[in-house]
């Protein structure tokens, strides 16, 4: 660790199709941090064990990917390194595991937000184009996504860390440079102000 300071942990959250992976990878590049994506880990596992036969099997692969993600993040943070972790973490469900790694770090949450019609359109377009790995079975899960959006499961996580909500409907609001500045700000700003971009 640098001067006794905790390492930086950036958690990138939001619904499928909200732009998390693109933003998370860009943040990791700008901050020179490793990028840990649950979906990328799930795809790597799927390449070895095969495409799941149904949604429950796909979900089991997702749980395995989460185990790898949290294990890798823990090792990196315990060694004093920072990381960017990205997934469609669910409010009211994902917080317990995240709090374990948050306790090891100077953690910040970047939550990607887009209007539900935008999310559903992007979600459909990417699997129709064949952009998504078959391990995700996206075509079979569109109905579940609509339900999750309506339920609020993809609202910002309850982690009591500094939180920035980034609107991704048309580019980034706030802009990328402002997002990076938020992440580079000094630690010790208190527990979890939620900053929402005004359009």
List the model feature ranges, each with a label.
Residues 61-106:
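Glycine-rich phosphate-binding loop used to anchor ATP phosphates in small-molecule kinases
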Residues 22-79:
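Conserved substrate/cofactor phosphate-moiety recognition/catalytic segment
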Residues 19:
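Conserved glycine(s) of the Walker
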Residues 16:
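The conserved Walker
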Residues 103-124:
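Conserved phosphate-donor/acceptor-positioning beta-strand/loop module used by diverse small-molecule
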Residues 12:
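Hydrophobic anchor at the beta1->P-loop junction of P-loop NTPases
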Residues 5-9, 81:
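Pre-Walker A (Motif I) flank of P-loop NTPase domains
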Residues 128-176, 197-199:
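Small-molecule kinase domains that catalyze NTP-dependent phosphoryl transfer to phosphate-bearing small molecules
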């Amino acid at each position: 660790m640098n001067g006794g300071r905790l390492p930086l942990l950036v958690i990138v959250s939001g619904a499928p199709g909200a732009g998390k992976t693109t933003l998370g990878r860009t943040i990791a590049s700008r901050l020179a941090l490793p990028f840990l994506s649950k979906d990328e880990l799930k795809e790597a596992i799927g390449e070895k064990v095969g495409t799941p036969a149904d949604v429950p099997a796909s979900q089991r692969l997702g749980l395995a990917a989460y185990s790898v993600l949290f294990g890798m993040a823990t090792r990196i943070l315990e060694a004093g390194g920072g990381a960017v972790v990205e997934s469609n973490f669910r409010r009211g469900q994902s917080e317990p595991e995240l709090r374990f790694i948050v306790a090891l770090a100077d953690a910040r949450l970047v939550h990607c937000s887009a209007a539900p019609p935008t999310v559903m359109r992007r979600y459909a377009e990417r699997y129709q184009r064949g952009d998504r790995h078959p391990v995700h079975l996206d075509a079979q899960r569109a109905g579940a996504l609509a339900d999750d959006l309506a339920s609020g499961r993809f609202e910002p996580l309850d982690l009591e860390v500094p939180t920035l909500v980034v609107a991704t409907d048309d580019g980034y609001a706030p802009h990328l440079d402002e997002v990076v500045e938020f992440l580079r700000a000094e630690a010790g700003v208190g527990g979890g102000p939620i900053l929402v971009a005004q359009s």
